[in-house]
Amino acid sequence: MKRIMTLLIVSFLSVGCAKISTTHISQQDQTALPHPTRILIKDFRVDSDSIQMATGLYGKIKAGISDESPEITKQELSSEVIGALNKELIEKITALGITAVHVEQNQQPVQNEIIITGKFLKIDEGNVVRRNLIGLGAGQSSLDSKVIVLRATPQGIKEILSFSAHADSGNMPGAAVMGPAGVAAGAATAVVVGVNVAKGAATTYKSNSANQASALADKISEELQKYFQEQGWIK
């Protein structure tokens, strides 16, 4: 019986892992571009209509204790998500050996500077109660974005790379579905998260979406690393 429960927990953890992916990669046919002097990170744009706040009882309680309008709340959420992505991208790109800094939208790059920008197509906080109780994708929180990489040339700013990036909370079964095994699996997940935090691999954010933005930055950085290596900018 113990072995069966162990197998169930391992299976649930494997199936329920958060999904992070990149698709629709479009690369301009350019090789051996000059090494960038800096990489400029600009805030990703997001429309208010593309933001879905936390739904269900939890969302109502959270909204009820705030005197602010839904639009202001959406603005706070988008600011945290954008800030999380900026912070993580700067750290990860700098770790690759290229200077990366955050700049305002109106800052114009100089020759051989690279710009990374884009747009969040969807920011969905999901339903935390359904996610924890039912799981299997119910109440899932998710992010969808379009990433655009530009280069400053004597002829102007040109796009050199673009792709879509997605992150979600996964399909982990909730406590009601898993029963006793759910409690054990939840504890196992907590241990994994705890280890990551202890290693300094995680930053605490208020929203699910901001935490996913941090994970999204990992995947975006992977695509950037491949491109940088192809150009000979890094080894």
Regions found by a protein language model. Give the residues of each.
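Sec-dependent signal peptide recognition
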Residues: 2-10
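A structural "domain/chain start" motif
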Residues: 17-91, 161-166, 179, 190-235
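Transition segments tied to proteolytic processing and entry into folded domains
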Residues: 87-90, 95, 105-106
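Generic signature of mature, soluble extracytoplasmic domains
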Residues: 91-99, 150-152
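Surface-exposed patches in mature extracellular/periplasmic domains of secreted proteins
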Residues: 97-107, 231-235
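Surface-exposed short loop/turn segments
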Residues: 105-180
